[in-house]
Design a protein with these regions (language model features):
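Hydrophobic alpha-helical transmembrane segments of small proteolipidic membrane proteins, enriched
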Residues: 1-72
Length: 72
């Protein structure tokens, strides 16, 4: 196992911890908000999906960096 492989694993591990925690918190808070105000569920769901997409973009950046490290 080369140092490059360890760097790739580290980048993916660290780069996906933050988005995973953020997505979990977003979903939990959205479910709480829908539970408190069911009439606003469409607006809450739309905002939640948009926020999840932004959080997931960080994990995709980590994937791109790890692929660059792996193959370049």
């Amino acid at each position: 196992m080369e140092l490059k492989d360890i760097a790739v694993a580290f980048v993916m591990g660290v780069g996906t911890i933050g988005p995973a925690i953020a997505i979990g918190m977003l979903a939990g808070k959205a479910l709480e908000a829908i539970g408190r105000n069911p009439e606003a569920s469409n607006k809450i769901q739309t905002a939640m999906i948009l926020a999840i997409a932004f959080a997931e973009a960080i994990a995709i950046y980590a994937l791109v960096v790890s692929l660059i490290l792996k193959f370049v």
